[in-house]
Amino acid sequence: VPAMIERNWGRVVNISSAWGSFAEGLEGVPSYAITKAALNALTIHLAREAGPDVLINAMCPGWVQTRMGFDSAPWEPGGGLPELTPQEGADTALYLATLPDGGATGGFFRERAPLDW
């Protein structure tokens, strides 16, 4: 990030999770929610520190439709969140990485749309 600030240009896409916005409700996996909430806070802090020329955002998918996610889940996949395909996740990351100058910074996105938290 310091080199991006020095050049007055850059893009950072943090991969977080919709679970990082919840204060409770993840019985059995609070450490996951806590680490994602910390990443969300870091996204906001870095965006403020970097200024308007370095865009720092986070994509926050819910469940991604992969075998690994469903086999390892300690709770019911989905949990009320819409599922996302791997392609939709990749499209969101590409969208954020290629935002035009003056685009959103310090935001959280799912399927190219900002999340209201």
Residue ranges and their predicted role:
Residues 19, 63, 113-115:
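Residue-level detector of flexible, active-site-proximal loop/helix-junction positions
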Residues 1, 5-52, 70:
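Catalytic loop of short-chain dehydrogenase/reductase
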Residues 11-13, 23, 65, 92, ...:
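Short, flexible micro-motifs
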Residues 28, 64, 105:
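Glycine-rich, flexible loop/turn motifs
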Residues 51-54, 58-59, 74-117:
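C-terminal helical subdomain
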Residues 23-24, 60-73:
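Short beta-loop-alpha junction of Rossmann-like oxidoreductase domains
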